[in-house]
Amino acid sequence: MWKPVRVVSANFLERIGEPESRFHSDYLAYRNGDVPQAELITRLPHVAMIGDSVCTGVYVSSPWSTFWRVRNCCGNSWFLDTNPAPLGIRSVSKRLEELTAFVAIECAGIGALVDHESERQNFLRRILRTRNFSGQIGDLLVMKRFPDLILISIGHNNVDWAWRSPTSDLEQPESRLQRQSRDFRKNFTRQMRRLIDRARVQRYRVAVIVYGLINFESYFIGREIAERLRSQDPSRYLHLETTYKYFTSFRPAYRSNLIRLARMVNKELRDMVRELNRGLAGATNLQLQYSDALATADLSRVELLHPIDAWHASVQGHNVLAEAAFRDLGPSLEFLGLNRPSGKTTAAHGVTRPTQMG
């Protein structure tokens, strides 16, 4: 059974052992034998990422290689990178480690959809052990240690409007786009209410940030450059066309309406957060925020696309997404009291080996 991956700051004992650390008293209790290490770790801030393949380091190639990569790789993305600084991606997790030691929880996975929990997944998603939005929310709800900060970036697979579309909808897509955006909001809202109900009963502060879908308009500028380069040199972007097997709406004929649907979805997300916040007036321990950081990031440079599939992000692409995503975390970090460094920081911060959540 698939479980979220938990990653603890590698040098967390050194960090919280410093007198100026906000967790120094917990460290002293641990050193005196009053608190076991497992309990000490639960007292660190916990940050969870809910999302789809945009939030992972996965890319598509041959079926077996993709299958192995999905099953065995984690991190190496804009949220979590397990390579010690300054190597790899300057991810959100590395930026957070400059402020505090913490526990990162990666729930995101390839192919994830914003779904109705009663829907049955197709065969491909089952063999990839895809966890849709409802499943990822469910994973958080059963955790003994509920996260302090929850980042949500999911829905990119839901804008594949041309997938299984009848010819009539392909020719006149307006009603289909409207229906898909409405259904998306209904399903997203239902899962958010589950999350909010659990967050409200915590005895500590919880911040949730919902990111809009990426800037597909600028993204396709880079994609078109990759397509031209491949037409000139077939050895480049070897699996560029493989994209169409999994994402019909990436075909040039359908892109303009994909961009439209993504904008519609982002409006629904913004309005949903505004509506949910009206019901949180008395919830002083919970902050809910919408961010357009990914929706406005400039993704038009071809080097931001992966050199194999020109679909998912390259290292440079993940760096752009990380910078954008972290920039909008300011209010959440301030709400949680994590906006100032705790203890000394060094350039050698890294993370431990990933472990499965129990």
Residue ranges and their predicted role:
Residues 219-289, 315:
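Substrate-gating cap/lid alpha-helix
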Residues 48-64, 212-236:
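Short, solvent-exposed beta-strand-terminating loops
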Residues 1-103, 332-358:
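N-terminal secretory targeting modules
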Residues 56-58, 113-116, 158-162, 216-222, ...:
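Short catalytic/ligand-binding loop motif for oxyanion handling, primarily in non-cytosolic enzymes
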Residues 65-193:
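Conserved SGNH/GDSL esterase-like catalytic core that processes O-acyl groups on lipids
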